Amino acid sequence: MKYFYSILISAFVAIALTSCLGDSDESENTYTAYGYYTITGNFNSSYTLYSDLGGKVIPTMSSVANLTDNKGFGNHSRAMLYFSYKPSQVSQDEKTITGAELFDGRYFDEYLPISKQQADDALITATDSIFQIRELNDVWAYRGYLNTVVNAPYSSVNGVNVKPTVNLVYDPASISENAITFDIYFNRHTDQNAASNGPVYFYTSHLLNFIDEIVPGNGDVTITIKTSNGISKDIKVSRQNFHKGNYE
C-alpha cells in the first residue's frame, strides 16, 4: 500500500465526503470518499471495512489486490482508505457500501501503550531520541483503539528515511478514578544532528483493552495526552470503547 500523508477526515465517507465524477443521471455517477477503518476478513475470501464514524464498506477483491500489490492487508488492522462507489451500491439505510473500488490509502501504525518503567527500560524516554511534535492534530477512541494523528518532522540518514515511532506512555502514579494521563513520545531513532524532513502526518492506533483493568471506577474515562513541548488534549471515552466487540 502506498505510504502517503493527507488531511483529516471530517465526516462519514458514504454521504458527506463525496465528489461526483460523472455527468449522466445520478444512478450512473461515481463518487469518491475516504475514511478511517478497522479491517476484518482475509485475502482468500473477502474484506469488510468498518468506519470509525459508523457504517461499513465492502471493497472489491480486485481493488484490494491492486492497492496491496496482490498481498492483501496482511496483519494490518487499521488504515485510512480512499475508494470510489456509485449510489446504487449504498444500502437503503445508508450504512453499507458494497463493491467499492479502493484506489489509495495508508496503514495506521499499531502499538500497545506502555508503562513509564517499560519506556525507560527501552530508552523511549531518552532525551536524545525524543523530537518535538509540531501539532497533535486529532485524538479519538473507537472500538478498542485510541487513535492519534501528529504532525512532525522525520529523519533521514544517508538519504534513507528513518521511520519514527509514536508511543503512549503512562505513569501508574498519574492514574486516578476514571482518569489516566499518557505522555506521547515521538522517537525518530536518530540523533539530533540527523537530516530533518517534513513535517508530515503520522497516524497511530493504540490498543486500549487493558485500561479497564488499571483505571479504577465504573464511569467514562477522561484520557489526557501530553507532548514533550506542552501540547495537551483531553477526551472522555466510554469504557465500552476500550474493547473491539463483535463487528458482525
Sequence positions of predicted segments:
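Bacterial Sec-dependent N-terminal signal peptides
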Residues: 1-6, 10-43
